[in-house]
Amino acid sequence: MQIILLEKIGGLGNLGDIVTVKNGYARNFLIPAGKAKRATEANMKEFEARRAELEAKQAEILADARVRQEKLDGQTITVAQKAGVDGRLFGSVTNADIAAAIVAAGIEAVKANVRLPNGPLKAVGEYEVEVALHTDAVAKITVAVVAATE
């Protein structure tokens, strides 16, 4: 199915690009989420009429993400979790736990933004973690996992 992208989508294209994707991806995700429209003549004309407005909106979203990236870059976020004597955690630290710690620090983030390439953190220590606030704004933070005191 051919669609018009209404925002930049990593691995797919930029605002206004006409791309071909699988029908299910378009119907079940991109179109309902407002990220794309079918590439019909009427939709293309409507898009061209609204192009400046959509570009301004995307620029505003990117500027907001860059501000949050500036606040986050280089920060150390501490997460306390119960641990054994050998430093292994009872449970693990997930992206939801890290996102909650970032929000507690006063910066807006959701768990989908936190990228843990090696899966949940299962031991005490410091870990480099990426927080993808936008496709063009990725902050690198240090997550310090410490043993919780009871």
UniProtKB/Swiss-Prot annotation:
Cellular component GO terms, alphabetically?
A: ribonucleoprotein complex; ribosome
GO terms of molecular function: rRNA binding; structural constituent of ribosome
SS bonds (residue pairs):
none
Query: Does the keyword Ribosomal protein feature in the UniProt annotation?
Result: yes
Pfam families assigned to the protein according to its UniProt record, in alphabetical order: Ribosomal_L9_C, Ribosomal_L9_N
The processes (GO biological process) annotated in the record are:
translation
Q: Which UniProt keywords apply?
A: Ribonucleoprotein, Ribosomal protein, RNA-binding, rRNA-binding
| Stored HAMAP family | Ribosomal_bL9
Record family assignment: Belongs to the bacterial ribosomal protein bL9 family.
Cross-referenced PANTHER family: 50S RIBOSOMAL PROTEIN L9
Job description of the protein: Binds to the 23S rRNA.
Record-given protein name: Large ribosomal subunit protein bL9
Q: Which organism is it from?
A: Neisseria meningitidis serogroup A / serotype 4A (strain DSM 15465 / Z2491)
Q: What is the lineage of its organism?
A: Bacteria, Pseudomonadati, Pseudomonadota, Betaproteobacteria, Neisseriales
